[in-house]
């Protein structure tokens, strides 16, 4: 995938270079003209056709490379949604387990408090009275 991304970046850089060169060459070699008139000289300009063909070929190569990338956008959303549903189910299960543990610990605390109470009563009753 990284190779394709590098290749895509190289192709985009090449296309930008072609466009920049085309503008520079056409600007330097094109004779002045009016915007509303089409001149025969401009239609016969060989550089225009060469640069147009090069840019079109570069654009087509970029399109072909982009089409070769794996499409995962829709699948990723489905996978994320399924994972969230699974996480919610696990969370509910863990919350239930936690509530059970809290209940058990509350019972154990009560039992320990009762035993401590009994121990203190026994100790108080076993002391000699003064």
Swiss-Prot record:
Has UniProt tagged this entry with the keyword Nucleus?
yes
Q: Which domain of life is it from?
A: Eukaryota
User: Which processes are annotated in GO (biological process)?
Assistant: regulation of transcription by RNA polymerase II
- According to its UniProt record, where is this protein mainly located? nucleus
- Keyword tags: Activator, Nucleus, Transcription, Transcription regulation
Record's InterPro entries?
A: Med7/Med21-like, Mediator_Med21
Q: Where in the cell is it found?
A: Nucleus
Question: What molecular function terms (GO) are annotated for this protein?
Answer: transcription coregulator activity
Q: Name one GO cellular component term.
A: mediator complex
Function recorded in the entry: Component of the Mediator complex, a coactivator involved in the regulated transcription of nearly all RNA polymerase II-dependent genes. Mediator functions as a bridge to convey information from gene-specific regulatory proteins to the basal RNA polymerase II transcription machinery. Mediator is recruited to promoters by direct interactions with regulatory proteins and serves as a scaffold for the assembly of a functional preinitiation complex with RNA polymerase II and the general transcription factors.
Q: Which family does it belong to?
A: Belongs to the Mediator complex subunit 21 family.
Q: What PANTHER family does the entry give? A: MEDIATOR OF RNA POLYMERASE II TRANSCRIPTION SUBUNIT 21 (PTHR13381:SF0), RNA POLYMERASE II HOLOENZYME COMPONENT SRB7 (PTHR13381)
Q: How does it assemble?
A: Component of the Mediator complex.
Put simply, this protein is called: Mediator of RNA polymerase II transcription subunit 21
Source organism of this protein record: Caenorhabditis briggsae
